[in-house]
Amino acid sequence: METALPAAGFLYWVGASTVAYLALRISCWFFTALRVWGLGHEAGVGPWLGEWAVVTGGTDGIGKSYAEELAKRGMKIVLISRSQDKLDQVSSEISEKFKVETKTIAVDFTSEDIYDKIKASLAGLNIGVLVNNVGMSYEYPEYFLDVPDLDNTIKKLITVNALSVCKMTRLVLPGMVERSKGAILNISSASGMYPVPLLTIYSATKAFVDFFSQCLHEEYKSKGVIVQSVLPYYVATKLAKIKRPTWDKPSPETFVKSAMKTIGVQSRTNGYPIHSLVASVSASLPSWLYFKIAMYSGNSIRVRYLKKMKMN
C-alpha cells in the first residue's frame, strides 16, 4: 500500500499535466480563431497593392475561387493554366461578373521551359498579388516503390508543386520589392505540416512549399511584401476527389472567403477554422499514434481504390 501511493501520485500528476496541456492548446486555438476569423481583417488586399493578381491553376477549385475573390476586390486577373478553352471560359465569367480586365496564359506546369513565355506575358504589369496554387497529387495513396510510373511521377510532382512556386516567385517578387508592397500566397497543404506516408512525394513537396514560404516571409516582410503559406485539409475539389462539401470539407468558395481573412494576420495558416482545430489536435498527438492513424487511413483508401479498379 505504501509503495502504491507514490505511483498513484505520479500518475495523478501525469494525468493532470496532460489535461492542462490539452486545455491550454484548446484555449490558444479559441483565441487564435477569435483573433483571425472573429476580429481579423485581411491586410488591405486589393488594387492598392498593384493592379493585377496572378493565379496559377486558376480555372478550377481553390485557384478559381482566389481569382474570383480578388476580382471582387477590383483587381485585374491573370489566369495561368493548361487548357486554353477552360482559361477562356473562366476568364469570360470573371470579367463579366466582376467587370475587371483579365488575361490568360496557357502553359503546362509539368514542363520546365514555360517560364520565358510567362515572363514575357507578365512584362509591364503592376502585379500586387501572386497566388501559387497549381499542384498535382497521386491518383491514390500508394507505397513509394509501387507508385505507377514512379520516375515520371517524381519528376512531375516536384516540377509542378515545388519548382513552379520558386520560378513564379522569381518572376514576380522583384517588382513587389521595388514598390515595397505585395502579397504572395503559396497554397501548400496540411500534408506539408506533418509527413503523410503513402503520399510521400506529394507530402514532401508541400513541406517544401511551407518552408520556402516561411523563409521568404522572414526575408521580405521588412520590404513590405507578405508571403503566406496556406495549409488546407480536405476541400471539395477535383484534386481531392470530393464532390460535395461538408462542414469539415468546405467548398473552394467557402474556404477561400475564410482564408482571405488571414492575409496579413497569419503568415502560416490552415485557412479555415475547422482545419485549424484539426491541426491543433494533430499537433498534440504523439508521433507513433499520428503515424498509426495516417497509415491506417491511407491504406484504407488504397485498398478501396485498388478493389474498385479490379472490379472495373
From Swiss-Prot:
Q: Which Gene3D superfamilies match?
A: NAD(P)-binding Rossmann-like Domain (3.40.50.720)
What SUPFAM superfamilies does UniProt report for this protein, alphabetically? NAD(P)-binding Rossmann-fold domains
Q: Where does substrate bind?
A: 189
Keywords of the record: Endoplasmic reticulum, Lipid biosynthesis, Lipid metabolism, Membrane, NADP, Oxidoreductase, Steroid biosynthesis, Transmembrane, Transmembrane helix
The record's section on CDD domains has: 17beta-HSD1_like_SDR_c (cd05356)
State the Pfam families in the record: adh_short (PF00106)
User: Which pathway does it serve?
Assistant: Lipid metabolism; fatty acid biosynthesis; Steroid biosynthesis; estrogen biosynthesis
Show the catalytic activity: a very-long-chain (3R)-3-hydroxyacyl-CoA + NADP(+) = a very-long-chain 3-oxoacyl-CoA + NADPH + H(+); 17beta-estradiol + NAD(+) = estrone + NADH + H(+); 17beta-estradiol + NADP(+) = estrone + NADPH + H(+); 3-oxooctadecanoyl-CoA + NADPH + H(+) = (3R)-hydroxyoctadecanoyl-CoA + NADP(+)
Asked if the Swiss-Prot or TrEMBL record annotates the protein with the keyword Transmembrane, the reply is yes
Q: Main localisation, per the record?
A: endoplasmic reticulum
| Molecular function as annotated in GO | estradiol 17-beta-dehydrogenase [NAD(P)+] activity; oxidoreductase activity; very-long-chain 3-oxoacyl-CoA reductase activity
- Residues where NADP(+) binds: 50-79
Query: Magnesium: is it a keyword of this entry?
Result: no
What Gene Ontology biological process does one annotation of this record name?
estrogen biosynthetic process
A GO CC term? endoplasmic reticulum
Q: What does this protein do?
A: Catalyzes the second of the four reactions of the long-chain fatty acids elongation cycle. This endoplasmic reticulum-bound enzymatic process, allows the addition of two carbons to the chain of long- and very long-chain fatty acids/VLCFAs per cycle. This enzyme has a 3-ketoacyl-CoA reductase activity, reducing 3-ketoacyl-CoA to 3-hydroxyacyl-CoA, within each cycle of fatty acid elongation. Thereby, it may participate in the production of VLCFAs of different chain lengths that are involved in multiple biological processes as precursors of membrane lipids and lipid mediators.
Family recorded in the similarity comment? Belongs to the short-chain dehydrogenases/reductases (SDR) family. 17-beta-HSD 3 subfamily.
What name goes with this protein?
Very-long-chain 3-oxoacyl-CoA reductase
What gene is this protein a product of? HSD17B12
